Amino acid sequence: MNLQEIVTKRTGKAISQCSNKELYFSLLEMTKGLAEEKGSNEGKRKLYYISAEFLIGKLLSNNLINLGIYEDVKKLLADNGKSLAEIEEVEPEPSLGNGGLGRLAACFLDSIATLGLNGDGVGLNYHYGLFKQVFENNLQHETPNPWIEKESWLTKTDRAYTIQFGGFNLQSRMYDIDVLGYNNRTTKLHLFDVETVDESLVGEGIDFDKEDIKKNLTLFLYPDDSDDKGRILRVYQQYFMVSNAARLI
């Protein structure tokens, strides 16, 4: 895929005339297309790594490196007066993980892809992650950490399941993120979301209605469990995740 062709198709401009945001989304389209061309690893058996969190970090640079085109893209941009490092700043970091468990899960997926093993990851598509820490008047405040945009590394799939709970059902939808192996094929990170999720439930800070499971299930990673409502919500999250994983497998 040719970056200039994608830029022209999207913006009608030359690379040198584009904003960093325009170039980021052009690189996103190019990288996703190249990942699709590489195809997935295959084998008689398949491994599924199921985790409540995947701390995958920003993906653009890592994917360009694993595709073997990082230096070429960097030079092309520099020749047009653009900085790849500055373009990378436009990318929001997926709010899908927080700590060691999430980083370990992400490393496993990287290894699976690079080693050419037939395996995928399964988790939840959190909209706001854990929280974003901001400081105002020397005081810490917790705010949502949104990352999902109209165009992102997420690819919506046709895979959907009806998950039964006591007294109600939830309709799930699977989204995929490609995890590129270094000079190898790709692994998929399958992320399940609730079709009825409602971001407007979130009020001041990261407060939200913990009882409305149909609308809140995938809003936050590790929602506050200092009360029974929060603890029950976490159980629902885990049940939803493993139920979808079982249906997928």
Identify the meaning behind each predicted range.
Residues 1-249:
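A conserved ligand/cofactor-binding region detector
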